[in-house]
């Protein structure tokens, strides 16, 4: 029997906003960090939560998502004040983040602004993207945090606005359900039933080949498009271009 200790930190951030073009974090700041410690699949209660003064205004669109006002942040610490405590908390752990590129991008950007030669997060933490995992488990389905809560029957009724600590706590429950195996049989059977039903009812129509040339997006273009939609959906709660 293995006695190895597995330490995971389920993490979420809220920010002043994001860029639609270029690096999504450039010129923006983290204003809230919420993190939940999980050791050997048990929530320990050793959480990390802080609000941060960004020294810039919160974009109206971002305020509409998380409801964190500029006035509320005026007396909060800046990132430099908490960075050492934060690094001590996450160092060596596996970070579980929904759409990890968003939060890791911001974290590495904030580290870089300090001019302290702090290395990239993925050099001292393993990073697991729960959104990527969900897409592998449920291809073609909605895999936002709210959608996963509904799928796994996890209560998210308190999530009227996005908040980093609440979202991290909810994601911890979702991730444990996704990786715990208790409900995997149900969803596997559900998917197999749907597949079999689909095979029985789909009628295939043979069409004559079209003379029109069809131009497909390259793999790089598709990846860039999906990455941008991920960012929109993570911070907006929904995405018009996804069903």
UniProtKB/Swiss-Prot annotation:
Top EC class, one word: transferase
Keyword Transferase set for record: yes
GO biological process: DNA replication proofreading
Active site: 162
Co-factor remark: Binds 2 divalent metal cations. Magnesium or manganese.
Catalytic activity: DNA(n) + a 2'-deoxyribonucleoside 5'-triphosphate = DNA(n+1) + diphosphate
Cofactor or coenzyme needed: Mg(2+); Mn(2+)
GO molecular function: 3'-5' exonuclease activity; DNA binding; DNA-directed DNA polymerase activity; metal ion binding
EC number: 2.7.7.7
Keywords in alphabetical order: DNA replication, DNA-directed DNA polymerase, Exonuclease, Hydrolase, Magnesium, Manganese, Metal-binding, Nuclease, Nucleotidyltransferase, Transferase
Amino acids binding a divalent metal cation 2: 12
Binding site residues for a divalent metal cation 1: 12, 14, 167
Summary of subunit composition and partner proteins: The DNA polymerase holoenzyme is a complex that contains 10 different types of subunits. These subunits are organized into 3 functionally essential subassemblies: the pol III core, the beta sliding clamp processivity factor and the clamp-loading complex. The pol III core (subunits alpha,epsilon and theta) contains the polymerase and the 3'-5' exonuclease proofreading activities. The polymerase is tethered to the template via the sliding clamp processivity factor.
Function text: DNA polymerase III is a complex, multichain enzyme responsible for most of the replicative synthesis in bacteria. The epsilon subunit contains the editing function and is a proofreading 3'-5' exonuclease.
Protein known as: DNA polymerase III subunit epsilon
Source species of the chain: Salmonella typhimurium (strain LT2 / SGSC1412 / ATCC 700720)
Gene that this polypeptide is encoded by: dnaQ
């Amino acid at each position: 029997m293995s006695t190895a200790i597995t330490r995971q930190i389920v993490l979420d951030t809220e920010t002043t906003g994001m860029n639609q073009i270029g690096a999504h974090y450039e010129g923006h700041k983290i204003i809230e960090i919420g993190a939940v410690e999980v050791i050997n699949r048990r929530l320990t209660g050793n959480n990390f939560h802080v609000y941060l003064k960004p020294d810039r205004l919160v974009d109206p669109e971002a305020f509409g998502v998380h409801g964190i006002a500029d006035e509320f942040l005026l007396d909060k610490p800046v990132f430099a004040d908490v960075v050492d405590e934060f690094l001590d908390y996450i160092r060596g752990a596996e970070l579980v983040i929904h759409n990890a590129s968003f939060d890791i991008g911001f974290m590495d950007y904030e580290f870089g602004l300090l001019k302290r030669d702090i290395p990239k997060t993925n050099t001292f933490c393993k990073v697991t993207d729960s959104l990527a995992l969900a897409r592998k488990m449920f291809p073609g389905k909605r895999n936002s945090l709210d959608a996963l809560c509904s799928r796994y029957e996890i209560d998210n009724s308190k999530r009227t606005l996005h908040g980093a600590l609440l979202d991290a706590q909810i994601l911890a429950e979702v991730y444990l359900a996704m990786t715990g195996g208790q409900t995997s049989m149900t969803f596997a059977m559900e998917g197999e039933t749907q597949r079999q039903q689909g095979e029985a009812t789909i009628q295939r129509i043979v069409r004559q080949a079209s003379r029109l040339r069809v131009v497909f997006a390259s793999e790089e273009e598709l990846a860039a498009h999906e990455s941008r939609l991920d960012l929109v959906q993570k911070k907006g709660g929904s995405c018009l271009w996804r069903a």
